[in-house]
Every structure is written in C-alpha cells, then in structure tokens.
Amino acid sequence: MGKNYYLAVDIGASSGRHMLSHMENGKMILEEIYRFPNGMVEKNGHKVWDVDKLFEEILTGMKKCALAGKIPYSMGIDTWAVDFVLLDENDRRIGDAVAYRDRRTEGMDRRVYGIISEEDLYLRTGIQKQIFNTIYQLMAVKEQQPGQLEQAKSMLMIPDYFHFLLTGKKVQEYTNATTTQLADPVTKDWDMELIRKLGYPKEIFQKIKKSGFEVGGLSGEIQKKVGFDCKVVLPPTHDTASAVAAVPTQDEHALYISSGTWSLMGTELKEADCSKSSMLHNMTNEGGYDYRFRYLKNIMGLWMIQSVKKESAPDLGFGEICALASKEAITSFVDVNDARFLAPQNMTEEVKKACEESGQQIPQTVGELAAVIYHSLAECYAKTVEEIEALTGITYPKIQIVGGGANAQYLNELTAKYTGKDVCAGPTEATAVGNLAAQMIAAGELRDLKAARACIAESFEMNMFRSDK
C-alpha cells in the first residue's frame, strides 16, 4: 500500500492552517503546508467572520498540496464552536456569519428563560450557560431579524458549511451540534421538542453524523479549482473535541487541559452528568469523539497573557515572558474568570485595576503582570481540579496539557505546584492531530481511539512537570 496523506484544515479565531500527515514506522508525521490569518471584522454594525475569504484560503492550501505532489486521501475541517450560517431555498447564504463575541445576544438568555427555565434547559442538554451559545444567537435572529429565520431552509455550523461548499452535501457533525445547547445528550440527536418550544424552524436542522462519517468526494467545480479529488471525512469539527481526541493517555479516567486562548479543563465521561450540582459548578457536557462526553469547564486561558503581550510587549516571545515571570516575587492574584477580562479596552490596565481594588500589590512590569496572570491561572486550575474530583468521585493522578499552552513551561510548573499533580504537556498541535487521527481511524490506518492515542504518545514529544506532593 502506498503512503496515504491526510489533510486537517484547522481554523482558529486568529489563524488557520493546513496540516498534512502520513504514517511512517508506526508514527504520525506532521507537515504544515499553509497558514493564513483570520479575525473578526466589523460589518453592518456586527462582528462577523469573512467566511468567503476563509473558503478561498481553504482552497489555496489545498492547491499547495497538489503543487507539493501530496494529494490527500481524505480531508476534514475543524473550527471554533457555536457560530453558524443560514441558507435559503437556493442554498444561498442569508446575511453574515455573525461571530460569537458580537453583542447581539445580550439579554437573549432572559428571552430563552421566559420559555424554559435555566435549570430545565441544563437538565435537558447538560450544556454550560455561555451567552454566545447557538441557542441564544438564534433567539437574537428571531427577535432582531425575523425575516432571516422565515427565509431560512438550512442552518449549518461553520465547519459544516465549508464541508458543504466542498462537496455539495449538508450534514451536521455531532461534537459541534452539542455546543448549540439544542441537542439531547441521551438520544445524541436534536431536541426537537425544545426547538419547537423556542419557535425555531425544525426543518433548518440537518441530520447529525458522528466523527468519521464520509460526507463525500469534492464537487466537480472544486476538483477543477484544486486539481484533485479526495474524500471529505468528518473530524470532531469543534476544535476542542479534536484536541481532546489527541490527549495521549491510556487511562480510563484522565484529567486534561486543552490550553489555548481558552483553557478547557475536564475529563471524559461515558454518560452526561446533567445534575443540578453539575449546573451549579458551571460544568458542561460537550460531545466528544465516539459519543464520549467532554465534561469540562471553560476557563479564561492564555487570552489574558496574549492581550498583555500585544499591548505592553509586542517584541517579546511568550517564552521570554514566561522567563521574566518566573523571576518575580509578586504575590497578587486576580479572578481569571471575571467577566471584566473577557474583552477589556486594555488588559494591562484591567489587571492593575483589579489588584488595586482588592488591596494587593499592583504589577508594574511585564514580568510582574505575567506572574500575576500565570499564578492566578494555576490557582484556578487547582480549584477546578477539586471541583471535578468532588463531582466525579475520582482522584486523578496527573494532568495532561495539550494545545499551544503546552509550551508555556512556567505555567506548567505552576500548575503542578498548585494542583499537587504531575503534569504531562504535549502535543502542542493537538487540534490538528485529533482531526487527523479521526480520519486515519475512518481509513483503517488506526484501529480505534485507544490505538490512536497510543500512536500519538509515541509520535510527539511530551514534557513532564513533577509536583512537590
């Protein structure tokens, strides 16, 4: 059998990239083929994604594969969750692809809770309340632009929309469907009774398919543009679900942090925990690969340090900022999950203000600011570990950190110190790796998720950080 290449298109809020992979001597070999910028743009008074430009970038990266003579056997696209497009009867897009950080959802939680209480909604879906969830975004469309919903014949989440543009076929991938807060964790299908109650048109919701499902080949038009045909296979299209699929552990009960702009900290469950205590701890039950549940908590993550770097130290690398922070003696803490840090005018000033208001030492230098943020994050991780252990009744021996934050050495050291658990960091490219692993399982190159995780552990460098306890 010749060498099979697999293509993951992994698009995040600030950039996207095409990662090719093949198997060599039982290991996954990764190669970045193309990288492109992304970001929200202001249009018609809203923050939106330029999905037309993004699709052109997807095609550009595919052409690069052809130029390199590395034609993928299959490809799959993952992006952030919750955002969607509406299509009319001719499959034309209605309006813009509005972004989750847009303010149109303000007050929409109250509209939803007028129809179903917050507690009942959690019992039905098991999904943590985030004001940007699709359920609130659709309520914003219904309230503010009802004509769009009346005109709509299909709703596609962003990665499903790109898969549709490639193949002409509409499907809804499971992991991303769960983030809408409109899916039933027991049936693994849309909660049509909830959808009817909310007054959303039932016919716009596509059939839900598992990761690994083959959507189809490229349409004739796309084949002409890129110069080849290949299968389009559903990865876990929610980027965090792909990252968690790449957690390199064989433990049945493992604790992970998918560490990037957000830190998603949790474990995998076979069944969702939609209990009231889970709701009160703001835990979520998002869908994972093979119908596992990602029982996790959203934590602010590296967004704060990214913002401070941009404002106060654009010329320093994150490694240098880590090194500066490790030399500081400042002991001030902030609540990293405070809404004030979501999108402040100036993160540097906001952190200083929070320290001043709580009567603590005010950080002055970049090193001090970074130290406050890293210590505060590690302390938050420690509290979250305690919550998860109390809710699941399981004591976890170590923490697996995957994603870009696996490179934040000082933060990893602090995480081990504050949690009292050993930390295993890597792979940093977890999202692309999980996307690729799902394709390789579908192709029969890897037996199942357990085999894929064993292969990932062999293929990529991991760093261990020992706790003192």
Regions found by a protein language model. Give the residues of each.
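N-terminal glycine/serine-rich phosphate-binding loop of ATP-dependent small-molecule kinases
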Residues: 1-95, 123, 151, 223-232, ...
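Active-site core segments that coordinate phosphate-bearing ligands/cofactors
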Residues: 2, 7-8, 20, 113-126, ...
